[in-house]
A protein has these predicted regions:
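Aromatic- and charge-enriched surface segment that lines or borders ligand/interaction sites
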Residues: 11-55, 71, 77, 209-211
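Surface-exposed binding/hinge segments that line
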Residues: 14, 18, 25, 60-101
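Short helices/loops that flank or line small-molecule/ion binding pockets
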Residues: 35-37, 157-167, 184-185, 213-214, ...
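Append "and occasionally in soluble cytosolic enzymes with long acidic Gly/Pro-rich linkers
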Residues: 132-133, 191, 211-300, 389, ...
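Ligand/substrate-recognition segments at binding pockets and active sites
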Residues: 270-338, 408
Length: 436
């Protein structure tokens, strides 16, 4: 809450002087939604599953854990291999949620027995998930709405049509170009929330045309971010000057980023051997109106610097595979942190082995050394200095051009109220209500 970690199942916790042992004290009387008590066996199963690379795709983010013990049903002791400044933040990830051991081992996630404010009552893949209130949750105020159904829409047009037809009460990922129309309609209301999700223009640095940092810098100078904020986001965004969000305590506040300078862009392109122009291909997600608008704006902006931008569209799965395989030149991407400490998310950029530099192919020895050193640096100022330097390096190399932090904008019918938002989890449905 408010960029801070607060207790949930754990009421209190303490950290040993050497930073290696975290002891969590759980609330008494915790129960799963089916009424069964939460036991030490369930806790050990759930947490060991989270750190097992054979069972959890998030295990790589919890490698600092050396062992987990539960002396009793209300005490959890986590021992680390080395002092880890972002451990507590990473330990709040959803993969560490506690489930009943028997239901987890069954492998049928439709029948997963959980202990949060809601549980999955029904799930049809690619269609919807139905959540119902947990009658045994320790804090009833966290579950006001009896039932929540989350539906999946194939594209922006389908989502908008279902919303206007009254099939859904609240629309996530509201198409930006429809916001003025929806805001002006008294049947609806629009609410915007600040986020920690940074948007980027990304380059495959192994593609010859953008392998030179001078070319990537030129494209950064050719980009007018303010136009992207207004033209593609209806103003629901804030410019960023580095690869992390504006609320991040690790942000290098001394960096001004790239300013819009067409002549500088032309000069850099000429230095890189493209004085007569350059043709590039931008790959975007089909059916995504915001990406289509960004592409149109970039096409016009980059043309002023002598760059011809061709745009191709692919479905999300195909495009993701292309990026992983390095089969693209220019793309659009974003990254949001999962907790108050941003190091886990930002490691995707600066530490190549994790995601191949956010699928850019970028690798920098100094960045990787700084990142590895920062993982065990408990001195706040020294750690911040390491991250400040990493941001300087990335901004100069420009495998990703940071553009803006967008706001999450939700359109809802006028009879919906009580919407809350969490910086790291997004919308919280706990207190949503609908009047008839």
């Amino acid at each position: 809450k408010d960029n801070n970690i607060i207790g949930g199942m754990a009421e209190t916790w303490e950290v040993s002087d050497d930073g290696l042992t975290y002891t969590f004290h759980l609330r008494d009387g915790l129960k799963f939604y089916n009424g069964d008590a939460v036991t030490a066996e369930d806790i050990l199963y759930s947490l060991n599953r989270a750190i097992d690379p054979e069972k959890s795709i998030f295990a790589g983010f919890l490698t600092a854990i050396a062992g987990i013990e539960c002396p009793d049903d209300t005490t959890v002791v986590v021992t680390l291999k080395a002092p880890t400044p972002d451990f507590l933040s990473n330990f709040t990830m959803p993969c560490c949620a506690i489930v009943q051991k028997d239901s987890g081992e069954s492998g049928d996630y439709k029948d997963l027995v959980t202990c949060g404010p809601y549980y999955i009552a029904d799930w049809v893949k690619d269609q919807y998930m139905l959540f119902k209130k947990n009658p045994n949750y320790y804090d009833p105020s966290k579950a006001v709405t009896d039932e929540i159904k989350v539906t999946v829409a194939a594209d922006d047009s389908t989502r908008l049509m279902e919303f206007q037809n009254g099939d859904i009460d609240l629309m996530m990922s509201t198409p930006r170009n429809n916001l003025p129309q929806l805001s002006a309609d008294s049947n609806y209301k629009v609410e915007a929330f600040d986020t920690v999700t940074v948007n980027y223009i990304g380059f495959n640095v192994e593609a010859e045309a953008v392998s030179s940092k001078e070319v990537r810098q030129a494209l950064a100078y050719a980009t007018n971010v303010d136009d992207l904020i207004v033209g593609a986001n209806q103003g629901y965004a804030q410019r960023v000057t580095t690869f992390t969000d504006n609320l991040d305590v690790l942000r290098n506040t001394g960096l001004e980023g790239y300013t819009h300078d067409v002549e500088k862009a032309k000069s850099l392109l000429a230095d890189a051997g493209y004085a007569d122009g350059l043709t590039l291909t931008l790959s975007i997600t089909s059916g995504n109106t915001t990406e289509a608008q960004i592409a149109a704006i970039l096409k016009e902006q980059w043309a002023q610097a002598g760059v011809t931008l061709e745009v191709t569209q692919y479905d999300a799965a195909t495009l993701t595979a292309m990026k992983k395989n390095g089969e693209y030149q220019v793309g659009l991407t974003n990254l949001g942190r999962t907790g108050p400490d941003s190091a886990l998310a930002l490691s995707f950029i600066v530490y190549n082995p994790i995601t191949n530099g956010m699928y850019t192919g970028w690798q920098n020895d100094e960045c990787e050394s700084l990142y590895l050193a920062s993982c065990s640096e408990l001195d706040v100022e020294k750690r911040a200095e390491m991250w400040a330097r990493m941001q300087e390096i990335e901004l100069d190399e420009a495998p990703l051009i940071p553009t803006y932090v967008n706001q999450d904008v939700y359109a809802m019918h006028s009879n919906v109220s009580g919407v809350q938002y969490n910086l790291f989890l997004g919308i919280l449905p706990y207190t949503m209500q609908k009047t008839v």
